[in-house]
Amino acid sequence: RGPVFAGLRGGVARLAEKTGAALTAQGAHLRTKTSVTGLRRIRNRWQVTAGSRTWDFDAVVLAAPAGAAAQLLRTSAPFAATRIRAIDYASVAVVTLAYPAARMPELRGSGFLVPPTEGFSVKGVTFVTQKWEWAARAAKTDAPKGVAIVRSSFGRYGDAAVLERTDAELAALARRELSTIAGLPPISLDERVTRWNSALPQYRVGHVEQVTRARDSLVDAPGVALAGAAYDGVGIASCIASGRQAARQVVRGLEENTVENHG
């Protein structure tokens, strides 16, 4: 039986790095750390505003979170904006802890999930250096005596009180609960808290219908497509499929527009 999980050596961030490098090599111009503040239709093109600068494009794929996309579409596609603005999100905080490997108990598997009925704040735990071979090698290189990396996540939809804690308080909570649940040492060598505010879209009953209606209404905003986890599912595979669908949509629209103009 093959492995249950698949990943990228060096972490998921490598996917964005390699994708950006591949696009740049093909002549694309990437503008990172640039916040888009406006989108409007002008003479059959889309004008994108970022700060004091503007650019004109034939087509735009909005792969931003639903709230940000709705804000950009509020004037040119108000119906779609209203529908996607209703998509709610949950926030999450990830606490990464480093432990001396020699003091770790014997752990089975690659981690575990914790249902809310158990009374703990932590909702999921990953034994990083046990799950990913590349992480284990990197940890051994950085700390020859051996380090075990454990990652835990906090924050459930509708119950974000735990996220109001400071980073130090969250790390202390993670250590306590991991010690109780899995017998991990009460003291860690190092810690890092990463917060992702409004990061996980929540799919209510009728989500697919609402997204379909929003997309159908974009016929009034030719050249614009929606893509991303807010609409088609979380996870890398779902986001890639969503992006490809959006790309095909705008390309098809551009081709049809070219035929009409030359027909």
Task: State where each predicted segment sits.
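Helical element adjacent to the flavin cofactor pocket in flavoenzyme catalytic cores
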Residues: 1-51, 55-59
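Generic structural signal for residues in well-ordered beta-strands
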Residues: 30-32, 36, 188-193, 224
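Mid-domain catalytic core of redox enzymes
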Residues: 34-164, 168, 172, 180-181, ...
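FAD-binding beta-loop-beta segment adjacent to the flavin cofactor pocket
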Residues: 122, 133-145, 196-226
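Flavin (FAD/FMN) cofactor-binding core of flavoprotein oxidoreductases
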Residues: 156, 171-219
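Active-site-proximal substrate-binding core of FAD-dependent oxidoreductases
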Residues: 192-195, 251-263
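Internal hydrophobic alpha-helix adjacent to the cofactor/substrate pocket in enzyme cavities
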Residues: 239-257
